[in-house]
């Protein structure tokens, strides 16, 4: 994996530097009560000099889905349909003074494991706090807190995985919602646009 650390990026978030940029690509949602549908996701990780990354993502239903997610896909040619959801928030490495906020190696020739906190808000009436780790070009997250407004859907827990594979950002989300147990909700692959 070769990349350049963006100018002005706070040292605290160097373990997340590989995410900085705009990513776009197809995926699928498949969950009880929702059914299966192709989606288009665009996610942006940016920095403003603070000890965090700014994060924004928009998900649309996909107008012209590829036959499958294998092989080359021209993500610029994908057409967004109706917006499905948006989310925004902050990805941060906890201060080293914080209890449990350790950066450690996981063994010889393994990238360091760095603890991570992610705070997200959605216009559907949800806010969530995820805790997890970044290890090289891989992120594992699980909700520590989920809150909703009186009209927000009942989502009780979620897990996310992000990984850089062959220069593409693979992602998957599992969730427990609508009385269902934790299970796969969505997944896809994103290509770096900037």
Per-range role (PLM):
Residues 1-194:
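Hydrophobic small-molecule pocket/channel-lining residues, especially in calycin-type beta-barrels
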